[in-house]
Design a protein with these regions (language model features):
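Intrinsically disordered, low-complexity terminal regulatory regions
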Residues: 1-86, 93-165
C-alpha cells in the first residue's frame, strides 16, 4: 500500500483519487483547489463529484461538477444542485453529516452505503470525500469526492438480462 494510503478505501479508483489528493497536498493538511486538476486522473472523472461549501446562516453544499457515470446512475444531472434539496436528503438530513464533518474538521470521509431511490432502485456504493481549500490552508471551501458503485444496480421488476449490466 502506498505511503499515506488509507486502508479503509477498497475501490481501486477511489484509492487512485486519494493517492492523487495526497500528492497535491505538499506540506499542508489538504490541497488547494488550484493544485487539484481532475483531468490528471481520467479514470476517476466519470465518478467524480466536486462540491462547493457555501457558508452563510447555514452551511450548504452545491455540486459544481458531477461525473457522467454518477449522473447516469442517479438519472439526473447533479451539477448546479444543492445536496440538501435532493429528496433523499430532505427525508434523511443525517445523510449530509459527512459533508459537514469534512468541511468543518478538514478530514477525509470513507463510507459505504445503500441507496434506495424514489423508484425503489437499490444500489450500494463506496464514497470518498476529501477537503480542498480555495484561499487558505485552514478553511475547507470545496470537497472533492467520488462514488464507486457495486454491481448490479437493482431495478425492481426489470429482469437482470434487460438491465444492460
Amino acid at each position: 500500500m502506498p505511503d499515506g494510503a488509507d486502508p479503509r478505501i477498497e475501490s481501486p479508483f477511489l484509492r487512485e483519487l486519494h493517492a492523487y489528493w495526497l500528492s497535491r497536498r505538499g506540506g499542508r493538511a489538504f490541497p488547494r483547489r488550484s493544485d487539484f486538476e481532475p483531468l490528471s486522473i481520467p479514470a476517476v472523472l466519470p465518478h467524480l463529484i466536486l462540491i462547493a461549501v457555501e457558508r452563510g446562516a447555514t452551511t450548504r453544499f452545491r455540486v459544481r461538477l458531477s461525473g457522467t457515470f454518477v449522473d447516469s446512475v442517479f438519472r439526473r444531472t447533479g451539477t448546479g444542485r444543492y445536496l440538501d434539496e435532493a429528496p433523499i436528503n430532505i427525508r434523511h438530513p443525517w445523510r449530509l453529516e459527512p459533508y459537514h464533518a469534512v468541511s468543518t474538521e478538514g478530514r477525509i470521509d470513507v463510507s459505504r452505503t445503500r441507496y434506495v431511490d424514489d423508484e425503489d432502485r437499490r444500489f450500494d456504493y463506496e464514497r470518498l470525500l476529501l477537503p480542498l481549500a480555495v484561499d487558505d490552508d485552514r478553511r475547507v471551501d470545496m470537497i472533492v469526492g467520488a462514488l464507486s458503485f457495486a454491481e448490479p444496480i437493482v431495478t425492481p421488476g426489470v429482469p437482470f438480462s434487460a438491465r444492460g449490466t
